[in-house]
Amino acid sequence: MVSKSLIVLLLVSVLVSTFFTTGAYPTSYDDDFDALDDLDDLDLDDLLDLEPADLVLLDMWANMLDSQDFEDFE
């Protein structure tokens, strides 16, 4: 009987903690889209100053524009 109560209490605590932390995720996703907008207006000097993670993001963005799947979303 105690083990069932403990399991129920554990599940409720996980659900409550998940509910209270979901507000943090949409802001982090918005930052990713802002980064894509920042990559739109690059010139050569900006390209030389990029961090490696920015270059990966730029490469992913270029591949997305070249892919056939992207044309389906237009």
Curated annotation (Swiss-Prot):
Where is it expressed, tissue-wise? Answer: Expressed by the venom gland.
Query: Which keywords appear in this protein's UniProt record, sorted alphabetically?
Result: Antibiotic, Antimicrobial, Secreted, Signal
Q: Name one GO cellular component term.
A: extracellular region
Subcellular location as annotated: Secreted
One BP term from GO: defense response to bacterium
Q: Which first-to-last residue range defines the signal peptide?
A: 1-24
- What family does this belong to? Belongs to the non-disulfide-bridged peptide (NDBP) superfamily. Long chain multifunctional peptide (group 2) family.
Q: What does this protein do?
A: May be an antimicrobial peptide.
What name is this protein filed under? Anionic peptide clone 7
Q: Which organism is it from?
A: Tityus costatus
Ranked from the top, the taxonomy reads: Eukaryota, Metazoa, Ecdysozoa, Arthropoda, Chelicerata
